[in-house]
């Protein structure tokens, strides 16, 4: 058994206990995050800015709207693989820190079979959730249409809402019950999507509570940290106009994006980033470690 509260606070605990080692994550995550921004600007920056400006005018013109969406397709083609790599390395590092702490390497960061398996798990889980959502959404639509034909629009709306809530509950159940797939795959050294389902039997509500509490803590921490960053930007930049340039930057080019204030903000945001990430990522391996203590799961 595990404590939902302990799991929810595991990110804070790991951050405190491994503070010095995690300092190495600051420049690494900072460089990776900056690289993501550069990719966005290089591959789709001008197009995204143009799309923002043209969106109201193209709403009634499907051809123009489709043309405006081209930058998004180019962006996804680059960002999705990059995010898989980024989070594959990140999740493997957190799992290594919590489940194999003696294997420090470069502050637990590496790139090898463990990271590739994490990427595979993300892809497979993403496909699973997409298929379940797609099939469920089609079923809800058919049910609502059949109800409308048989009993009228009012009843169909009610049935559609209830069926939609049931689909949402199914997706949440899947997400919670399969949430240990990453940790289990790392610990066993083989891709295992559904072993988590058996492992979490009887623990759904404590796990859901732990994840919800961790999410609330993460939101509070993010608000506190970025309120401080906003205050610094306003103070140094001389007013709210500086903050506007930071939170709504001009992505037309690298030169227009990386202004002095944006660079200052990015550098400051690098510092808390690893510790904020731990709040959301650590609960799952913490729960896995507790549930498998003394076993070979």
Which stretches of residues belong to each language-model region?
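Membrane-interfacial helix-loop-helix connectors in multipass membrane proteins
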Residues: 144-163, 236-252
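Alpha-helical transmembrane spans of integral membrane proteins, capturing the lipid-embedded, hydrophobic core
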Residues: 22, 26-34, 80, 84-85, ...
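Short, membrane-exposed interhelical loops at transmembrane-helix boundaries
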Residues: 60-67, 198, 240-264
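Nonpolar helix-loop interface/hinge motif
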Residues: 1-49, 167-238, 265, 297
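Membrane-interface segments at transmembrane-helix boundaries
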Residues: 1-13, 52-67, 83-152, 177-204, ...
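Selective recognition of hydrophobic, aromatic-rich stretches within alpha-helical transmembrane segments
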Residues: 34, 38, 68-103, 154-190, ...
